[in-house]
Regions:
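Phosphate/Mg2+-binding loops and adjacent switch elements
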Residues: 9-130
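ATP-dependent carboxylate-amine ligase
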Residues: 76-257
Length: 257
């Protein structure tokens, strides 16, 4: 397979009929923080557009034969062959209500019609049963990467140290908990998801090392920070998940190998 990714490019200034390729030197203002983070991590072709079908066509022109649409379940203008629904295992479905009264974008019963359910950091615990048994994934983090150099250090090197930690993601407490669970003494500061960081946001007078998420790092690498680190995380997936996806692709005639 030659995979590619399409995304809305949240936070980017981009017209509805415009398509942009995400490059390793793209700016967050051009393509959004999450697409740029994905590009730097996986390297596959990535295009952003509010009209995702246009981004898909751009991937097709590059020879991609599998398209992953980032955060695309509710983008019904784009047809799909396989749906993978990922839940945050800590927050799950909250109070079960739809936005704005709760965290859900659709009723929980929607999972009866999705192909795969993946729980991030927990097991399935609802009486509503998905089409297939839910699978588990866990985020693993073991080393810190310097924001402005190639240096990396084991996270354990910072155990029992005081650090500043910032997070502008959907669930910042997960990041802070990871640091605390590794023995770090955290002075935390929360920002909104997709926060456009400024120099003032990342300057602290206490002289402590500054730690951030990988997503926030793509927005802070423009600043000249001498003691700043970010924490890359990797998803440890169930061995069964890849096999099930391949089986599903075969059943849809996408794979004959």
């Amino acid at each position: 397979f030659k995979p590619g990714v399409v995304s809305r490019g949240y936070g980017a200034s981009i017209a509805a009929d415009e398509v942009r390729e995400v490059l390793s030197d793209s700016s967050v203002l051009e393509v959004g923080d999450e697409p740029l983070m994905l590009k730097l991590r996986v390297g596959c072709p990535i295009f952003v557009s509010p009209t995702r079908s246009l981004a898909v066509k751009a991937l097709e022109a590059q020879g991609c034969d599998i398209v992953i649409t980032d955060d695309g379940m509710q983008h019904y203008a784009l047809a799909r062959d396989i749906e993978i629904c990922v839940f945050d295992g800590e927050r799950k479905w909250g109070n079960g209500h739809l936005l704005p009264m709760g965290p859900m974008r659709e009723p929980l019963k929607r999972i009866k019609y999705t192909d795969f359910i993946v729980m991030n950091g927990a097991d399935w615990s609802s009486s509503i049963k998905p089409k297939q048994a839910a699978l588990r994934m866990d985020l693993e983090a073991s080393k810190l990467q310097s924001l402005n150099s190639e240096q990396s250090l084991p996270l354990s090197n910072f155990s029992a140290q005081k650090v500043n930690a910032i997070a502008g993601i959907g669930n910042p407490q997960r990041f802070f908990n990871t640091l605390v669970n590794h023995g770090l003494l955290v002075e935390s500061q929360v920002f909104g998801d997709h926060h456009p960081f400024t120099q003032a946001d990342v300057c602290f007078e206490n002289g402590l090392p500054l730690l951030m998420t990988e997503k926030d790092a793509v927005k802070c690498r423009q600043f000249n920070l001498s003691a700043a680190w970010y924490l890359p995380v990797s998803a440890k997936l169930s061995d069964d998940l890849a096999a099930r996806i391949i089986t599903s692709l075969k059943s849809k005639g996408w794979f004959n190998g």
